[in-house]
Amino acid sequence: MTRTPFTLSLRSTDSVFKIRQSLSTVLSHSSTKIISRGYITIPITSTIAYHRPTIRLFNMPIAAPVRTLSSSQPLKRSTSPLPAITPAQNLLRLKAHLQNLPTPLLKHVHLSKIRREDPNLFFSVMRDELTDLAPIVYTPTVGEACQKYSQIYSGPEGLYLNIEDKDRIPEILRQYASKLVTPPQILVVTDGSRILGLGDLGIGGMGISVGKLNLYVAGGGVNPHGCLPVVLDMGTNNETIRNDPLYIGLKQSRVGLEEATEFMDAFMAAASEAFPKAVIQHEDFYSEAAFDFLARYKEKYRMFNDDIEGTGSVILAGFLAAAKQASEASGKPLRDHKVVFLGGGSAAVGVAKEMMNFFMMQGLTEDEARERFWLIDTKGLITSTRADVVSGKIASHKKFFIRNDTEGKEYPSLESVIEYVQPTALVGLSTTFGAFSEFAVRRMAELNQSPIIFPLSNPTSKCELAFSDALEWTDGRVLFASGSPYPPQQFKGTLREPGQGNNFLVFPGIGFGALQAGCKRITTGMITASAIALSEALTPEEKQKGLLYPRLERIRAVSARVAAGVVKQAQEDGVDTNETLRGLDIEALTEEMNKAQWWP
């Protein structure tokens, strides 16, 4: 196959790269070069070509930007100089342009272009318009962007490694690390196998890694030059995507878990050696792999899984607030809450395990806490007498919550489980739109003065229950939190604000806190501490309004508080190395986290 090569030139006066199409059909780079724009420096190696490169360039603008007043040197031109445009003018222009774009996806694409060309401008608009733009740069819009990643692709955004590179990963990352001026602080890594609730999107998962890091910077204050998005291309089982002529990933079926584990072993070892101070966040691996990798690497590397641990943390925080309100309304003890889950994937099991800490805080043993949960998957309530459990065919991660007390009776539907359990809380992680039926929701309202209902599946197109329906079917008594954002609703003359159990409220604080503490690893206690810190971050006004989570516009302050809680727990667990933070109380630690945040 004939390849069209390119060469790069860097002008020191304006740090602009121009792609020049070569007339030759042979790509020749005699030496490795470095570019540095956007999140992180990316080396150009001889392995780069237009077809399936091992390492691609990140944040490479396709045209020279207009000179601004902040430029260190004027551009040397023979013609009249360009007008000097202030950063404030650029920011106003970008905001106006975004307002004129008709769809969220077009806004997402334009913002991605701005981030590659001018990171300061991108994060300035994110700072000013975070509440409006978070759903654009991340869920729900990022789901569509990942589905259409190859169609809207306009340039490389991070580190792309495929299964064919398995034996070369240590060499690749050693060479890569040796050329970096700014080493990575945060790596967000996915294999694209379970993107949100949308399934296997292959190399399109890069959009999730980039989106998460956008939020790390905007919400957590991580320096964008220390962020590295990574996609591990192991093929895809999505035939529609794989057969698309525009698809830029490996056009083969996804490898099995054994081969994927060998690839992950190589990557985790090489990444931790090349970037010894970085935090590695696993994102959107399919359930079996997610649990296997978390168990395999948690005690060995500085890593966590956001789908399992981050989701568990944020839902535990919301449940802490909701359970207190519900118990105040009913007069029932906190330890008597009963929770039904619709969904048996990695996120559901991870959330349920984290929520067990709530009941253990009330004095229950671990076994007693586990008995407060009932999990429903596609076959119904998970019981010891169900056929797939008896035959041993049930996924291993579900075994922890098998019920042994149903006396041989099976409960195939959500409605039948609600009648059997009579729960106080209903949590959805099924990725099935509308799965919380009107009958189920109304029955929850009959059973509880303040029913706790958390439809958490992302994006909105996969959410189990809309906020408006939740209000109507419970006569406004619902304690509601969703995974994707819903707008406030007028109900009987009162403006009601929905809770959003968005991982955005915790994962920046977990990662940032682990970085600031210099953690050797990220403990289970640190994850639980992040949930407690989030629940304590509510202001008196937010509590008075019955909110379950802090408002998103306060995310920087919230992230600092979460990070402080993570640092404190790291010190108690003996995994911190930053001695300068030891001995500080939580208020002083929060102030230190605020000072350490990066701002555009």
From Swiss-Prot:
It holds the Pfam family malic. Keywords: Cytoplasm, Metal-binding, Mitochondrion, NAD, Nucleus, Oxidoreductase, Transit peptide. NAD(+) binds at residues 194, 344, 347. (S)-malate binds at residues 194, 458, 502. A divalent metal cation binds at residues 283-284, 307. Belongs to the malic enzymes family. The lineage of its organism: Eukaryota, Fungi, Dikarya, Basidiomycota, Agaricomycotina. NAD-dependent mitochondrial malic enzyme that catalyzes the oxidative decarboxylation of malate to pyruvate. Its EC number is 1.1.1.38. Its cofactor is Mg(2+); Mn(2+). Gene3D superfamilies: Malic enzyme, N-terminal domain (3.40.50.10380), NAD(P)-binding Rossmann-like Domain (3.40.50.720). This is NAD-dependent malic enzyme, mitochondrial. GO terms for cellular component: cytosol; mitochondrial matrix; mitochondrion; nucleus. PANTHER family: MALIC ENZYME-RELATED, NADP-DEPENDENT MALIC ENZYME.
